[in-house]
Amino acid sequence: MTMVMNELSRKIILKLPYGDDFRFVDEISFVDENRIVGNYTFRVDAPYYASHYPHNPVTPGVLLLECMGQIGLVAHLVYIEKIYERENVALIPSLSNVQASFLLPVGQGEKVIVEATKIYYRAGVLKSDILLRNSSGEECVHAVAHLKFVENEK
């Protein structure tokens, strides 16, 4: 990743409306108006693994979708709207109309790569086709989702 992309990734992540305990984005490795690619490594010690299939822990599907939404929709919108360049703006996202297929489980400590392609962005709604792959490149989840958002002053 280039120094410019590294700095842009940092700026985008800082504008995401999530605290450290609920941010599922480690890095944005590519972004333009139509596409975004990022990654996240699920922590081995995350508390949900103790209760989600305790004898064979897997990452809950709702958290996979959250990761996909944070990278593929919210971070992409921060880029498209150039929110990363603006001061005193807070983004309030609302995920809706999600269609998802879960294809492979994601385990503890696994790094996932999320790639989203914009289908359209109009009237404050971003619709994207989003893929979540494991570090071997295997497709684990495929989703199409909409994101609506409101900007608030901080």
Language-model regions, residue ranges each:
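HotDog/MaoC-like acyl-thioester-processing domains
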Residues: T2-M5, R35, P105-K154
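Hydrophobic beta-strand-centered segment that forms part of the acyl-chain substrate-binding groove
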Residues: T2-V4, L73-E115, C140-V144
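Hydrophobic beta-strand core residues of beta-sandwich domains
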Residues: L16, F42, V58, A100, ...
